[in-house]
């Protein structure tokens, strides 16, 4: 099945979304002045992109050969963005949700594409004040991307569990570690992909939905992993945005390694069954609710695993591919992430550590401060605590 030459790098790209934040109130900015967005565009250059809400922007990276390049680029981007916003009394957070954002107050970006989304999907769209980490990994033209997707799909809740960063919603503890993934289920064609055997079935699926008017001619499904339409890639969309660049780099690298591994298999995706899809859906539920405390199954015949055991299994399966790509440190970095706690756990710990007399908003402001600090960190190895 492989169409890779020996030694060929695994190309990848990243899209990150940032929530603009007032440094005084710690609230998400609803309507940033035009000069703020102008300065953001100048800071990020051609990779700047608008998002659904005026107080949210996106960066779409160039193509990289290695996750280390992606990490260096994101640090550069975040540093430039932080400098551009500072003169306006603003900062940004890169997380699945903003602890103090109120979706009622947010304003849609006045562009035709976004207006269509808000008109068509109403409350589901207006409530989607959420940010994800999207990773593109190249798949050779000769390789069926749905077969690769089916091979990688069972592992996506593991990546989600390492990315969790949206425990707060509307100023309250949601009870989930990724409330973003809960909110995503309000949309059609999100979450777990339909059960498809090959790319022809995917093309038939899109053709059917376009034929009945459910999708536009250039539209795609919004699944947590999907074949991209504009690029020869498989795109991971399930993961929450990561406050720390090191975590985003680790997750992007892991996904790229998984895709390369699948591309090298003679029969990728052939073991993906309807029963595995049922387990996949339950693993996603476990990940978004319990994270490291969840219990996970890759096979009906297997004993449940905790997240650490699942990560060990991933290293057994993908370790040789990671080594061949020069990505050996990924699994140790993932273990460090797991030992230190995902972003959602860090946010909840910060919230709980505030003085007993603190009110709900004061506790959430402290969490925003943590996210502001983690998101602006531009150093590859930072051990300093937030002030």
From Swiss-Prot:
| Source species, domain of life | Bacteria
Enumerate the InterPro entries for this protein.
GCL_type2/YbdK_subfam, GCS2, Gln_synth/guanido_kin_cat_dom, YbdK
Q: Its catalytic activity?
A: L-cysteine + L-glutamate + ATP = gamma-L-glutamyl-L-cysteine + ADP + phosphate + H(+)
- Please provide, alphabetically and separated by semicolons, the GO molecular function terms listed in this UniProt record: ATP binding; glutamate-cysteine ligase activity
Keywords of this protein's UniProt record, alphabetized?
ATP-binding, Ligase, Nucleotide-binding
Tell me if NAD is a UniProt keyword of this record.
no
Q: Pfam family of this protein, just one?
A: GCS2
Q: Supply one GO BP term.
A: modified amino acid biosynthetic process
Q: What is its EC number?
A: 6.3.2.2
Functional note: ATP-dependent carboxylate-amine ligase which exhibits weak glutamate--cysteine ligase activity.
Write out the similarity annotation.
Belongs to the glutamate--cysteine ligase type 2 family. YbdK subfamily.
Protein name per Swiss-Prot or TrEMBL: Putative glutamate--cysteine ligase 2
Question: Which species expresses this protein natively?
Answer: Pseudomonas fluorescens (strain ATCC BAA-477 / NRRL B-23932 / Pf-5)
């Amino acid at each position: 099945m492989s169409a890779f030459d020996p030694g060929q790098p695994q190309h990848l790209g990243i899209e990150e979304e940032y929530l603009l934040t007032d440094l005084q109130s710690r609230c998400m900015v609803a309507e940033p002045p035009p000069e703020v967005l102008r300065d953001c565009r100048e800071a990020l250059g051609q990779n700047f992109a608008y998002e659904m809400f005026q107080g949210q922007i996106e960066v779409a990276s160039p193509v990289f050969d290695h996750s280390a390049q992606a990490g260096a680029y994101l640090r550069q981007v975040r540093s430039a963005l932080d400098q551009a916003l500072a003169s306006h009394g603003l900062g940004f957070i890169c997380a699945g949700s903003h602890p103090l954002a109120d979706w009622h107050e947010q304003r849609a970006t006045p562009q035709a594409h976004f207006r269509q989304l808000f008109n068509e999907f109403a409350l589901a769209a207006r409530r989607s004040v959420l940010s994800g980490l999207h990773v593109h990994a190249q798949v050779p033209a000769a390789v069926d991307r749905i077969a690769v997707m089916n091979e990688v799909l069972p592992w996506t809740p593991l990546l989600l569990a390492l990315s969790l960063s949206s425990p707060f919603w509307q100023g309250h503890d949601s009870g989930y570690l990724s409330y973003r993934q809960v909110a995503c289920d309000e949309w059609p064609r999100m979450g777990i992909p339909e059960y498809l055997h090959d790319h022809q079935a995917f093309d038939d699926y899109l053709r059917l939905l376009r034929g009945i008017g459910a999708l536009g001619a250039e539209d795609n499904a919004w699944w947590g992993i999907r074949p991209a339409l504009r690029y020869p890639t498989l795109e991971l969309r399930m993961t929450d945005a990561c406050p720390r660049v090191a975590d985003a780099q680790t997750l992007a690298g892991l996904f790229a390694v998984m895709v390369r591994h699948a591309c090298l298999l003679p029969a990728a995706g052939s073991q993906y069954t309807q029963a595995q899809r049922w387990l996949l859906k339950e693993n996603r539920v476990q990940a978004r609710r319990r994270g490291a405390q969840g219990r996970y199954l890759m096979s009906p015949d297997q004993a449940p695993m905790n997240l650490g055991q699942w990560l060990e299994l991933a290293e057994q399966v993908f370790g040789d591919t990671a080594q061949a790509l020069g990505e050996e440190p990924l699994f140790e970095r993932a273990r460090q992430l797991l030992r230190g706690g995902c972003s959602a756990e860090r946010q909840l710990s910060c919230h709980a550590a505030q003085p007993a007399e603190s009110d709900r908003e004061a506790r959430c402001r402290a969490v925003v401060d943590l996210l502001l600090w983690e998101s602006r960190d531009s150093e590859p190895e930072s051990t300093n605590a937030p002030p």
